[in-house]
Amino acid sequence: MFSRRLSIGLLCVALSAGILAVPAAAASKGRILVYSGSTGYRHESIPAAVEALKAIGAKAGYTVDASEDPEVFSAEKLKQYQVLVLVSNSTDPKKPESEWFTDSRRDALQGFLKDGKGVIGLHAAADSHYNWPWYGQMIGGYFERHPKGTPKGTLTVVDAKHPATAKLPKTIERNDEWYYYKDFNPTMRVLVTIDPASIGDGEPDVNPNPLVWCHDFGGGRVFYSALGHTPESYSEPYMVNLLTGALAYAASK
């Protein structure tokens, strides 16, 4: 008993004197905002996407906040974040009033990029804010249509030097909802494409169709991926690796 008390006493003295180093909790690299509010078609994959991004961000050392309140888009609130992820934040193209990026919120998003920060758009982030051309330029294009259902298609990595594609296989077959775009900016750095002929169902052979791309825009970095219509997508190693690299890219200076 005396020996145990002596050991505890010596430990307390050592700690108070700073003799023993106690590892501190790792400091966060910064904050990521995941926004998934939608006023158009609501994707059932949104909860899975948010949870996956929380896990991926935390593993990379970031604090991840999630919101569906458009009031988060103020200059004051956005300044605490390094990366903004827009998860299937669709609006109704037939209802301009469904768009929440208006006035000061537009200024806040533009200021966010101007400060050298990063934006990631996922899936229906391209199906949003059709009445704000700057938004479409930021994303790289607008959703136009997709084949019926979630058919299997063949994806090809065309640029493996990007962090988002560095760990992906050269080609893969997977199921998803495959987007085609209008007003696509051909100057995008395209990372992944799909062969429309591989989808079948009479899809026109417009080869190749871009699915994942990035570019420098407005003073910051923007990454977009069309993948992720289904909840199951976000547990696939392919998607986890893609999103891990996308966050690294968006957070880089």
Segments from the language model and where they lie:
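Catalytic beta-strand/loop cores that center a nucleophilic Ser/Cys/Thr
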Residues: 141-218
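Bacterial N-terminal signal peptides
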Residues: 9-19
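Bacterial N-terminal signal peptides that target proteins for export
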Residues: 1-11
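Alpha-helical scaffolding within the catalytic cores
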Residues: 67-76, 107, 206-212
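Extracellular ligand-binding/catalytic regions of CAZymes and related secreted enzymes
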Residues: 26-30, 36, 44-47, 51-62, ...
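Solvent-exposed loop/turn segments at secondary-structure junctions
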Residues: 38-41, 70-73, 89-93, 119, ...
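Short alpha-beta junction capping motif
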Residues: 32-35, 78-129, 219
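N-terminal signal peptide c-region/cleavage motif recognized by signal peptidases
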Residues: 21-23
